[in-house]
A protein has these predicted regions:
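Active-site neighborhood of HAD-like aspartate-dependent phosphohydrolases
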Residues: 1-50
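Short acidic-hydrophobic, aromatic-tinged amphipathic segments that line or gate anion-handling sites
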Residues: 106-111, 159-172
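Short hydrophobic segments within beta-strands
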Residues: 6, 83-85, 128, 148
Length: 181
């Protein structure tokens, strides 16, 4: 099976990393968990994004509970590709943050190329994604999608994908997809 996973918001807690960054740098910020994209909705978002990405914050994001262990178990049995909307110049920091994960490939492709990279290049059997518009796009492309339901902004995505609440549920979801397809 070819498995592809997003990174931020799925494997790594980018949201909490950004909140910690704003607190440490004394940047006023109020997070709205109903909206996707902690930086996207920020005033002067490109400047703040560049500041966040230029430091060590990006290479020190915390893993969601169980994500590393489950991904390594999956990687021992399947192809595991990681794709992130981070720009290619952030590849080194992202690889540093993910050094404990045994993935097949890591793609830092930028926001504009993520959908194309997944659908046309990787062509996974299953995609793990949290961005609502990409969940829908991958579903329309015929890719089975599962998503973490711990983000309020993924509410309603059950129409297009299968939710999971804990990473230890993922192997069973993938096994069930093999037996039902």
């Amino acid at each position: 099976m070819i498995i592809c996973s997003d990174v931020d918001g799925v494997i790594l807690n980018y949201i909490q990393g950004f909140i910690d960054f704003t607190r440490k740098e004394k940047i006023p910020y109020s997070h709205n968990p109903e909206l996707y994209g902690v930086i996207r909705n920020f005033p002067d978002n490109l400047e703040v994004r560049d500041q966040f990405h230029s430091g060590e914050y990006l290479s020190q994001l915390k893993f969601y509970d169980g994500s590393m262990e489950i991904l390594n178990m999956l990687a021992s049995k399947h192809e595991l590709h990681l794709v992130t909307a981070l720009e290619p110049e952030q590849s080194k920091k992202r690889a540093e943050n993910l050094k404990m994960v045994n993935y097949t490939t890591l793609h830092c492709v930028g926001d504009d190329r993520k959908e194309e990279t997944v659908v046309e290049e990787i062509q996974p059997d299953v995609m793990i994604e949290d961005r609502p518009e990409l969940i829908e796009a991958f579903h329309r492309a015929g890719i089975r999608v599962i998503f973490p339901d711990w983000h309020p902004y993924t509410k309603g995505m059950e129409r297009f994908a299968t939710p999971f609440s804990l990473w230890n549920e993922v192997p069973d979801l993938l096994h069930n997809s093999l037996t039902t397809d």
